[in-house]
């Protein structure tokens, strides 16, 4: 797997990770839909300590609206508003990079869909993809 690189819409915030992705996950929960401004959120999970901000300083929003009620930190560009990545204690030392910020998303092959109980009825999940009604155990 090559280095994962990406950044925000305006280019002020750039990141990279040299780690192999832990998973590629599509989240259908209401919180992620609102955060992404879309019908779901496509994320690439990497070890948190592998994610390096190369330029810029992302702003942080502390979100407590998830099912656990624990803090979930959402990082975004303060200039253009692009959501870059997120992490929280409930998920251990994992950072979830927003796939839309990748320089090259063509290698993505998401096969895990979570919070399918909150999936919008007009969103189709590919046949054979693993589905979980909430967070997998």
PLM ranges: what are they?
Residues 1-137:
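A short Gly-Trp-Pro
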């Amino acid at each position: 797997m090559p280095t994962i690189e990406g950044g925000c819409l305006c280019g002020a915030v750039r990141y990279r990770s040299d780690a192999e992705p832990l998973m590629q996950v599509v989240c259908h929960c209401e919180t992620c839909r609102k955060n992404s401004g879309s019908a779901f959120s496509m994320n690439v999970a990497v070890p948190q300590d592998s994610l390096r901000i190369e330029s810029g300083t992302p702003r942080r929003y502390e979100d407590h609206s998830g099912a656990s009620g624990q803090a979930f930190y959402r990082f975004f560009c303060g200039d253009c508003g692009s959501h870059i990545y997120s992490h929280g204690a409930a998920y251990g030392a994992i950072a979830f990079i927003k796939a839309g910020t990748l320089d090259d998303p063509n290698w993505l092959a998401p096969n895990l869909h979570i919070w399918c109980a909150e999936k919008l009825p007009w969103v189709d999940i590919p046949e054979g993809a693993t589905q979980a009604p909430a967070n997998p155990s």
